[in-house]
Amino acid sequence: MKIVLAYSGGLDTTVSIRWLKETFKAEIITVTVDVGQKDDFKKIEERAYIAGASKHYTIDAVRQFANNYIAYAIKLNGLYEGVYPLSTALARPLIAEKVVEVAKKEGAEAVAHGSTSKGNDQVRFDLAVKALYPDVKIIAPARIWNMTREDEIKYAKEKGIPIKVESDKYSIDENLWGRSIEGDIISDPSLEVPEDAFEWTKQIYNKKEIVSIEFSNGVPTAVNGEKMELNKLVDFLNLKFGSHGFGRVEHIENRVVGFKSREVYEVPAALGLIYAHIDLEKTIYTPMELRFKRHIDQLWSDLVYQGLWFEPLRETLHKVADEMNKWISGEAKVEVSNGSFRIVGRESEYSPYSEKIASYNKGWYPSDEMARGFIEIWGMHSLIARRVRGL
């Protein structure tokens, strides 16, 4: 039997290699997908072999993640419950896709992952695999063995397995779009998140900085006039915005699996780019377009968070987003300082904004007759309803 395991190099999946091998008497093939995490992939490969893998794949998917996933998170202002930029959720279907590709290539009977029965990731991974490879068996060791973190460490030591324990306190998941932090006192929502939990958003600079971001068809293409590939641009802004202490998200999140959790993320580039994109949309879209766009933004964010990347509606929303973002080209100027972020200017050739019309100091004014007629018609529904109801 061959089992292909989605392998991060962390504690859960490292222990899974030996457990799967011994439990199923199987050959274990590990797959690590590079989606922008700052890991030593050579060491991860070595750890996989020592733990018992017969073959290991390291797959570079950074550009694909940026161009096919992050680009749409920007075009569709992907913020789950208005705050979380979907950093972890967004990467899962791509990782699953690469694992399935290896499983098909190797003729594996099963694929495995390290998600627990409490997490959203089990839903995302399982549904992605079912969509891409319906006949393959899915194994989630952590859903079967119910070992605690301490149990896993003990098991690894007993088996002589080298493990990477990211921190005595925290469990970290990281990719190009963000960093999530769990563990220690974070699960108590009444307590402040300790400063030592953060890595990307430690404030280095005390002076404010103005940053110009250029967009073309809804996707950022340049920073301060310098053209960049999207993955490089995101990486650059993670450092730029994070060094000013900006990009922390802490909130109570409604999980897919039926309960609320306290979640903490570092997402400096993600938040900054989405905020800038939203501002350009407000500058360019008509009121009706803007209302419609906000509706599909929320719908898309919910689909991605809930593990429904392969839902047909998500593909339709991408087509709508491509069409609507044809007009979202221009420049947003942002100020970042001391953990804060604000838009300080914007311009676009597609903006209907007219200073001549909008200014109170000069230019066009409607006549008194025009204003009175507009107000009368605008309020007619409400005024007549009040009259007939005797209000």
Curated annotation (Swiss-Prot):
GO biological process, one term: argininosuccinate metabolic process
Binding site for ATP: A6, Y7, S8, G9, G10, L11, D12, T13, T14, G114
Locations listed in the record: Cytoplasm
Keywords attached to this entry: Amino-acid biosynthesis, Arginine biosynthesis, ATP-binding, Cytoplasm, Ligase, Nucleotide-binding
Pathway assigned to this chain's UniProt record: Amino-acid biosynthesis; L-arginine biosynthesis; L-arginine from L-ornithine and carbamoyl phosphate: step 2/3
NCBIfam families per UniProt: argG, PRK00509.1
Subunit record text: Homotetramer.
Protein name: Argininosuccinate synthase
Organism name: Saccharolobus solfataricus (strain ATCC 35092 / DSM 1617 / JCM 11322 / P2) (Sulfolobus solfataricus)
Organism classification: Archaea, Thermoproteota, Thermoprotei, Sulfolobales, Sulfolobaceae
